[in-house]
Amino acid sequence: MADKIKAWFDAEADYLEVRFSDAAGYEKETKHDAVMERVDKDGQVIGFSVMGVSKFTKGNPLEADLVAA
């Protein structure tokens, strides 16, 4: 597990990004339309992003599994 994470929110784009590592990586689709995984060259999850994050509320939370191959 990462010692630190980096997270930022772009209100205009309604976009949240969370990174567990600064390692080079790429975005990969998940089963959830709003979520993308960020994986490194070995396929390890090093972060994720959420589009349309404001539609997820306490009564309608986002639930997604981050599973890299």
Residue ranges, per PLM feature:
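Small, basic N-terminal interaction modules of short regulatory proteins
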Residues: M1-A69
